[in-house]
Design a protein with these regions (language model features):
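Non-catalytic, polymerase-adjacent accessory regions of viral genome-replication enzymes
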Residues: 1-47
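Amphipathic alpha-helical blocks
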Residues: 38-62
Length: 337
């Protein structure tokens, strides 16, 4: 795989590749009004978009903002559908091909086959291994403060420029990167933002692996776990990581960052992880039970069928199955709704 991207923009740009990006973008959303309207003239719209990108006259539109409360209060910035096609085309043809494949094996989140469940199982395997070689050891649990809001775009652009040597692709990169009109922070909701955020903290992954020589690390977006032999080593490594994040990436760790003995278990991605046990955290259990009650109410009010409710619940089965929580599963799925 080439280390840099050269003269690839126009090679990848075609009516067919943009149409494919459209087909990928609309998956699971084909009943939405904006997509129904787009589909009515999709060939015309895709050809127009192709000409815009070919002539470098494409301009990113503004965003619609709204808030979500789960898992916490966050502001989501939604771009119009045709811009989302560009995001998909950009990520699938360049980011996935040239950046994602070079990520550390211990990096998870928004990567195919490397979701939350995989990250938790990976941490558990690390803990098993460290228990065998050290018996008792220490955990460095790190969480970046307001990660998406604090990403410095100039630093991110410089990181991207190391690999992107195609001036046309750099033009589009800047169009997307600065599309929300601010120099700091990525819009939560963009398909590109997840990838950019992973590229940004890949710098930390490489630093921990090559400079600090940390063998046992796992990162799920901005949540990081590192396992070390002694408390002294944990303190030293954490101080170095703090300095690196502040000096190189203009980021800080939040107050949830801590050092503790492995016997306490690790709270990570909604699970409580020990070397030989993996449980859903109490907070996660409460949310699941709350969802069951909500579905019961929806069915009783005639807003949802029993089949739809059970289908929705089944979507959480993977989350439950990863953990050793058979009793919880039986309680939830025995509910008559």
């Amino acid at each position: 795989m080439p280390k840099t991207i050269r003269n690839e923009y126009y090679k990848k740009l075609s009516y067919e590749s943009l149409m494919q990006a459209h087909l990928e973008s609309r998956k699971g959303k084909s009943t939405r009004k904006e997509i129904i309207q787009f589909n009515l003239k999709q060939e015309e719209y895709i050809m127009w978009l192709y000409e815009q990108l070919k002539n470098r006259t494409y301009r990113h539109s503004g965003y619609t903002s709204f808030y979500v409360t789960e898992p916490k209060l966050r502001r989501i910035e939604k771009s119009i559908y045709i811009d989302r096609i560009v995001h998909r085309w950009y990520v699938d043809n360049f980011m996935q091909e040239y950046f994602v494949k070079s990520f550390s094996y211990s990096s998870f989140a928004c990567l195919k086959g490397k979701g939350m469940h995989n990250a938790c199982l990976y941490v558990q395997e690390m803990m098993k291994h460290c228990k065998r070689i050290w018996n008792n050891y220490y955990v460095i649990k790190m969480d970046v403060a307001k990660y998406f809001q604090n990403i410095d775009k100039q630093i991110l652009y410089e990181i991207l420029c190391r690999k992107i040597k195609d001036k046309n692709l750099l033009w589009l990169t800047r169009k997307i990167l600065y599309s929300n009109g601010v120099d700091k922070g990525l819009p939560i909701g963009n398909y590109t933002s997840q990838c950019f955020a992973n590229i940004y903290l890949n710098e930390l992954d490489q630093y921990m692996k090559h400079k600090l020589k940390l063998k046992y690390t796992c990162r799920y977006m901005d949540d990081v776990v590192a396992l070390v032999n002694t408390k002294k080593e944990a303190i030293e490594k954490l101080n170095l990581i703090r300095s690196f994040l502040k000096e190189k990436l203009c980021l800080e760790l939040n107050r949830k960052t801590q050092i503790f003995q492995s016997t306490q278990g690790v709270n990570f991605c909604g699970y409580k992880i020990n070397a030989y046990r993996l449980k859903i955290r109490d907070k996660g259990k409460r949310k699941l039970k709350k969802k069951v009650k909500f579905l019961e109410k929806q069915v009783k009010q005639g807003k949802m069928t029993c089949i739809e409710a059970h289908k929705y619940l089944s979507g959480h089965l993977g989350y439950i199955n990863v953990a050793n929580t058979k009793n919880l599963e039986n309680k939830l799925f025995a509910t008559e709704i």
